[in-house]
């Protein structure tokens, strides 16, 4: 299958901007229905170098994440955290090791960059879901997330 890349839709740009404000170059972002590497599992989404890769036989691809279910939008926001990290100069193929943790405990006063790269993705995803009224089991209050995120303002 040829690499089917596309830019963000207008809705996806607005969805991402509702979280990241102007901290991402949205014109540079691409979504691809191709594996990033031969070892990418079918239902794993990867965004190591500024493009979000969906396995062509996986179930994650959406034509427009802004029109998708809230859980799918949460996945999109998690992957956009990796785009944000990449655009800040983090070389994710080296920063993301096989034992990266997704689970986290918010520590008062600890800035987002002090959490692991996958923990950052989950923290931002959970804040996004809470803002939209979803329940996130075990999550602290939205107020705690809001003090942690560096995208406030705008």
What are the residue ranges of the model-derived segments?
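Catalytic zinc-binding patch centered on the HExxH motif and its immediate surroundings
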Residues: 33-55, 61
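Short pre-active-site segment immediately N-terminal to the catalytic Zn-binding motif
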Residues: 44, 55-77, 112-113
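Glycine-rich loops and low-complexity Gly/Arg-rich segments
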Residues: 32, 53-58, 77-80, 99-101, ...
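Phenylalanine-focused residue identity feature
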Residues: 20, 38-39, 54, 65, ...
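Active-site recognition of the HExxH zinc-binding catalytic motif
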Residues: 74-86
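Acidic/histidine-rich, surface-exposed loop or edge segments in extracytoplasmic proteins
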Residues: 1
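Metalloprotease/metallohydrolase-associated module, dominated by Zn2+-dependent proteases
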Residues: 4-24, 30, 47-49, 87-154
């Amino acid at each position: 299958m040829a690499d089917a890349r596309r830019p963000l839709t207008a809705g996806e740009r607005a969805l991402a901007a509702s979280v990241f404000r102007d901290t991402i170059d949205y014109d540079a972002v691409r979504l691809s229905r191709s594996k990033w590497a031969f070892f990418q599992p079918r239902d794993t989404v990867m965004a190591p170098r500024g493009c979000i890769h969906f396995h062509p036989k996986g179930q994650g691809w959406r034509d427009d994440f802004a029109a998708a279910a809230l859980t799918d939008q949460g996945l999109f926001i998690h992957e956009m955290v990796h785009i944000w990290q990449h655009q800040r100069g983090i070389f994710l193929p080296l920063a993301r090791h096989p034992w990266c943790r997704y689970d986290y405990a918010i520590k008062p006063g600890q800035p987002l960059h002090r959490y692991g790269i996958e923990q950052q993705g989950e923290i931002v995803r959970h804040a996004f879901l809470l803002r939209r009224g979803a329940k996130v089991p075990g999550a602290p209050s939205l107020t705690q997330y809001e003090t942690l995120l560096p995208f406030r303002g705008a």
